[in-house]
Regions:
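Short aromatic/hydrophobic "clamp" motif used to bind/position activated sugar donors
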Residues: 95
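A conserved acidic beta->alpha catalytic loop
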Residues: 45-54
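Conserved donor-nucleotide/metal-binding helix-loop-beta segment in metal-dependent transferases, i.e.
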Residues: 109-125
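A recurrent flexible, glycine/aromatic-enriched loop bordering the glycosyltransferase active site
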Residues: 155-159, 165-190
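Short beta-strand-to-loop element that shapes/binds the nucleotide-sugar donor at the catalytic cleft/hinge
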Residues: 127-147
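A short, conserved alpha-helix in the catalytic core of glycosyltransferases
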Residues: 181-190, 194-199, 205-232
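Short, well-formed alpha-helical segments that are part of the catalytic scaffolds
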Residues: 19-32
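Glycine-rich, basic loop-to-helix element that forms the pyrophosphate-binding segment
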Residues: 72-90
Length: 261
């Protein structure tokens, strides 16, 4: 297929709960740095109390967003259920899932399509972006994720250096040309048909956030192909996905109801 002219081949999808500042940065990066800048973009906001709903209503036309807001879910759908909700609204061939606390580099979406065409083709499969993440937990390096000092690009939305990160990504792509057979649960491109076939996330895990492990096991058992590429890069603010409230890395939520997506 002609990848260059298929802006409606995919739909970007984000499910969020109280990630307003990071969500704004994520949406901005998708619209500015994606190859398919005008592709459909579904946002699902659940039980948000931090101004997310108001910001989405005010900016949905500016960013051409398809916005869905639920304010009093009990029990909550959680991130897995939110992904399922977003997927149910997709009308394009591909779904491109993102978390709310990411920043995407140039042409990340086009490179995922290229990877899918090359390694998955007509089979069932899902492809992923190389992740760059601030080293909040003193993690060990692993395939698919580069841990950098927290001050390298910034660990928060308010001190993130967009220009420096994009320069790093351009240089990284020049020096690294690799694919890895694995999944990373941040940015995943999958055919809508394949998502429906596997049944999406299992709601028995809601509203917790371990559902991707179960999803990947089911995909593996069904013969799905997994592949990750160095050509598609994203920054993942682990401070939010790791459930640190209010950007304070010294605190953790005490109640299940405080868990944020």
């Amino acid at each position: 297929m002609n990848l260059e002219n298929n802006m409606s081949k995919m739909t970007f999808c984000i499910s969020t709960l109280n990630n307003n500042n990071y969500l704004q940065l994520a949406i901005k990066s998708v619209r500015e740095n994606s190859h398919f800048k005008d592709a459909p973009f579904v946002i699902y906001a659940e039980n948000c109390t931090d101004g997310t709903n108001e910001w989405l209503e005010e900016n949905k036309d500016k960013y051409n967003l398809e916005v869905y807001i639920e304010t009093d879910n009990n029990p909550k759908r959680g991130i897995g259920g939110g992904m399922n909700f977003c997927a149910s609204k997709v009308k394009t061939e591909f779904i491109n899932f993102l978390q709310a606390d990411i920043y995407v580099a140039k042409d990340w979406d086009l490179e995922l399509l290229k990877l899918h065409e090359k390694y998955v083709g007509k089979d069932r499969g899902i492809v992923f972006s190389q992740r760059v993440q601030p080293d909040i937990f003193n993690d060990s390096e692993r395939a698919g994720t580069i841990f950098v000092p927290m001050e390298e690009f910034g660990e928060y939305y308010h001190n993130f250096d967009e220009k420096y990160f994009l320069e790093f990504c351009a240089e990284f792509r020049k020096l690294n040309k690799f694919t890895v057979r694995k999944g990373e649960g941040v940015s995943g491109l999958i055919r809508k048909e394949d998502w429906d076939y596997i049944g999406g996330n299992d709601d028995r895990f809601a509203p917790a956030y371990c559902e991707d492990m179960d999803l990947f096991i089911r995909m593996q058992n069904e013969g799905f192909k997994f592949m990750l590429t160095s050509e598609s890069l994203i920054y993942h603010f682990a401070s939010r996905a790791s459930r640190f409230p209010d950007d304070d890395l010294t605190k953790r939520p005490q109640e299940l109801s405080d868990v944020e997506q």
